[in-house]
Amino acid sequence: AVMAEIPLVVVNVQRGGPSTGQPTKVEQGDLLTVMFGSHGDAPKVVMAPGTIEDCFYSMITARRLAEAFNMVVVVLSDASLATAQQPFPRPQFSTEWLAPPVDQNPVPDGVKPYDWDPVTGLSRRFVPGQPNGMHTLTGLAHDRNSRVAYDPEINEQGMRARSMKLATLQKTLTPPPVFGDREGELLVVGWGGTKGAIEEAVARLRGEGHCVSSTHLTFLQPMQPGIGEILRGFRQVITVEGNWADDPGDPLIDESNRRYSALAMLLRARYLVDVDCWTEVRGRPIKPGTVYA
């Protein structure tokens, strides 16, 4: 689907691993696998709902993005969201939720199935049965006419186009909201099903007078704009996640071999901010009291 640029939505409900791991138990261990676990460079959108209400609307957003950008969109949920219950306001139906009508008009002469825009990387999608739209769908490297091609220059053009679609999407996103003040002593960063626990703990700490805020990331690839500025507004930044990270207090661990949690590693690499992490992989949802402590 990545090479052929076919719209596809994949739902990944994470559970305890690796291998058979802990069936039915919660974990957030798939983030890096979803982003980078493929042969070759395969750009895809990764978004993580933080609440059950988010799960509902994320599927609508994911479908729209997949069709607008002809991309794979992964909705990265987890077992705690998949098995929990939560009341939320009844959704008000909108025609924007619907897929646009299928364009069955003849393809104009000279238009190519992979006529990548030089800036955005986007190209028109040809649908089956569209007059003048016959082309080849293949997982092989191909040229703008969908013909298999191993030409070095054409291959780089295709790779660039698929990557630029992520950059194009990123320019349409808004910065993540900050729960609390935008500057202070400590910022707690989370993603996925940890949202409720983090915000409840932060609210309790703020009620006691602590300068603590939090932000929760929905888009993990591409990341939303403005994150770097948010991180730099705090003296300390820490992620709270349900995946493994080494304990810096372990006698074997130092900065040359410490494994950081998935999101902490991504934030450190992209924004060059000293992001620390706290993690728990007990197979159960992280509790507000644990974050508070």
Q: Residues of each region from the PLM?
A:
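Glycine- and acidic
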Residues: 41-48, 183-186
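Flexible, low-complexity linker and terminal segments
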Residues: 58, 63-293
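Thiamine diphosphate
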Residues: 1-36, 45-66, 207
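A broadly conserved detector of short glycine/acidic/proline-rich loop/turn motifs that flank catalytic sites
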Residues: 12-15, 38, 50-51, 79-80, ...
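Short, conserved catalytic or adaptor-binding loops enriched in Gly and charged residues
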Residues: 33-40, 267-271
